[in-house]
Amino acid sequence: MKEKKKGNIIGILIVMAIIIFGVIYGGITLTKNWGKSKETISKENATGKLKKICKDININEVEPRKSPIDLGVKDVKDTIPNIDKYPAKVENTTDSYIEIFSTGEKAGNGKDGWLIDVANNFNESKFEINGKIISVKVREIASGLGMDYIISEKYLPDAYSPSNELWGEMIKANGKTIELCDDRMVGNVAGILISKEKYDELIKKYGAINLKNITQAVANGEINMGYTNPFASATGLNFLVSTLATFDSSNPLSEKAIDGFNEFQNNIPLIAYTTLQLRNSAESGILDGFIMEYQTYINSPELKTDYIFTPFGYRHDSPLYSVGNLSNEKKEILNKFIEFYKQDKYQELAVKDGFNALEDYKC
């Protein structure tokens, strides 16, 4: 009797389970589309429909079209900072003075501070012109940036000393008044530094190391080399001009020269804004060679140990220009300053700082 009763209970439970399952399933079926539009529901079968639609789509490849980009810059003046970003390294000590823009290898710190030492000594000497004590003010400005200030006339110094004469020629080409007063403050040379291992490899293949052979080695993918931005760096600009000339010495801007340079450029892994970036890349093993001035090279023991210096291009003798139409008083101050730093003791100081070497090298 008990077994019969137990069987009835099990049967009832089974029937109830079937009924509950049916109710739940039916509820889900009836409510699963509640709140959904027909459009939403149809997306559940999107894959199948998309396949049908794609069969009717034709694909045409269109050649990419270059479109002019408006950077919104109307003037170079808008792209360079206010001069306050570059405070004077030597302040004038009198009201009668000239201000000089100078590059960092001679207006920097330590061995790069030759002009700073000279200017301070000049000011301490208290020279007079027409009964007035005179002085100089020195601001450290890179060659390219100094040119931008002068061309844009955002800020005009009285005198400008880039690393080489290429910048002065560009300023003249832009119609600005600039006059070469001294073609050499201190002697210096641009060069290519090549690791000793790579140098030996190139000697075996080419027999000599010069700019022409180096550019050929780069074009052949035999050496990884970097250089600095020619719009900012004097060494970079010198390298650009000199490299173009290796492809066509009669016309560095000819199609032949440009094609040769483009082939060369395709194998350049790095164009850096500063020499420091190049040095860091070389230390990491990315580069076999890079460009640098001799004065910096000779003052860096680790570079002399690992790299060989090969000079190239125009000399970097730090010419000195007057800027604009100077008053007679300012012209006299400038001439007095030139006379001052030309003294043997200041040229000997320049030698101690790494300048006035490789005197026999000519472009």
Label for each model-derived stretch:
Residues 3-18:
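N-terminal Sec-pathway targeting helices
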Residues 23-39:
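Hydrophobic single-pass membrane-insertion segments
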Residues 101-105, 218-250, 261-268:
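Short beta-strand->loop
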Residues 182-191, 231, 261-264, 298-327, 331, 340-363, ...:
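Periplasmic-binding protein-like
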Residues 197-206, 232-233, 245-253, 325-334:
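Short helix-loop capping/hinge motifs at secondary-structure junctions, enriched
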Residues 245-309:
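Ligand-binding pocket segment of bilobal, Venus flytrap-like solute-binding proteins
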